[in-house]
Amino acid sequence: MSRRRFDCRSISGLLTTTPQIPIKMENFNNFYILTSKELGRGKFAVVRQCISKSTGQEYAAKFLKKRRRGQDCRAEILHEIAVLELAKSCPRVINLHEVYENTSEIILILEYAAGGEIFSLCLPELAEMVSENDVIRLIKQILEGVYYLHQNNIVHLDLKPQNILLSSIYPLGDIKIVDFGMSRKIGHACELREIMGTPEYLAPEILNYDPITTATDMWNIGIIAYMLLTHTSPFVGEDNQETYLNISQVNVDYSEETFSSVSQLATDFIQSLLVKNPEKRPTAEICLSHSWLQQWDFENLFHPEETSSSSQTQDHSVRSSEDKTSKSSCNGTCGDREDKENIPEDSSMVSKRFRFDDSLPNPHELVSDLLC
């Protein structure tokens, strides 16, 4: 097995199609006003709220550096654009409005998701404010988006609560999947093996350097459901080594104390996804037919007012907790420790609604194999 360095010039699984959306070379500032609201920051990108001068519409401007650690990474950015274009008809994926380019950056003008990350819903402060029916609706929407991607042979590979946004927080809006910087195209001709992702969300096959499949995303959906329902992170340890051990051994707490307010159907759903063998995980399509999700459809058909009132009861608590999202951790476990290291000390108050930085230390120095 040959090994090669993981760099922007030799990453496998990137879409190579030329973007259909025009990449404008005009000055971005001639068309948009940047507000003082910074939505997120990483090592190679920053997202800021902006307003169209012609329409007054709010957007999120994602500034991506074309050179990273001395390497030309324009192909990676074009891949992200291509994935967003491919998914433009899917309402569960963030919409790409325009693209600008200058000498050092490519700027993606994205739909503005005012509700922020669903990570805020994982916080213990909101444990009684988000009902299981709310979680069911969100998980079902995530599955709809992931099913669309998988049907087009795209795996996201960085699904986590920080990369799922809400169109609004009150009433509880619809989800928008963001950050396709780590996504890859999979096919029948080649096997893709890469070490990538955020430590506590890595699937066992990633740690074992086994082939990446759509099942890798399904593992992450299991984690997201677990966090939304229990307000704890299932695998995070005191350090990365302990976290990796928990993942490789699938050490998950299903105790009565942790799952006291979680239904058996929800527990079954999570347990079906958090299994070590990726071939035994259900697909997104199969998950959409799971009894847990179908139960919500049945109840909402006859009692739609319950779902509405559930979302409305969140207003005061959600608004008061929203600003805590960037500073709070889920019982000290839900925070993305690697990402926090990339936020400047003077930006501690910045809301991290977007995550797009490389989650593992020095990922471009890790190894990638493409077996054809």
Curated annotation (Swiss-Prot):
Composition-biased stretches (Basic and acidic residues): 316-326
GO BP terms, alphabetized: apoptotic process; intracellular signal transduction; positive regulation of apoptotic process; positive regulation of fibroblast apoptotic process; protein autophosphorylation; protein phosphorylation
Matching InterPro entries: Kinase-like_dom_sf, Prot_kinase_dom, Protein_kinase_ATP_BS, Ser/Thr_kinase_AS, ST17B_STKc
Record note on quaternary structure: Interacts with CHP1; the interaction induces CHP1 to translocate from the Golgi to the nucleus.
Documented EC number(s): 2.7.11.1
Function: Phosphorylates myosin light chains. Acts as a positive regulator of apoptosis.
Annotated binding of ATP, by residue: 39-47, 62
Reaction catalyzed: L-seryl-[protein] + ATP = O-phospho-L-seryl-[protein] + ADP + H(+); L-threonyl-[protein] + ATP = O-phospho-L-threonyl-[protein] + ADP + H(+)
Enzyme class, spelled out: transferase
Tissue: Highly expressed in placenta, lung, pancreas. Lower levels in heart, brain, liver, skeletal muscle and kidney.
The keyword Nucleotide-binding is assigned to this record: yes
UniProt entry keywords in alphabetical sequence: Apoptosis, ATP-binding, Cell membrane, Kinase, Membrane, Nucleotide-binding, Nucleus, Phosphoprotein, Serine/threonine-protein kinase, Transferase
Name of the protein this chain belongs to: Serine/threonine-protein kinase 17B
GO molecular-function term, one example from the UniProt record: ATP binding
Compartments reported by the entry: Nucleus; Cell membrane; Endoplasmic reticulum-Golgi intermediate compartment
Active site: 158
Gene name of this polypeptide: STK17B
Annotated segments matching region Disordered: 305-362
Lineage, highest ranks first: Eukaryota, Metazoa, Chordata, Craniata, Vertebrata
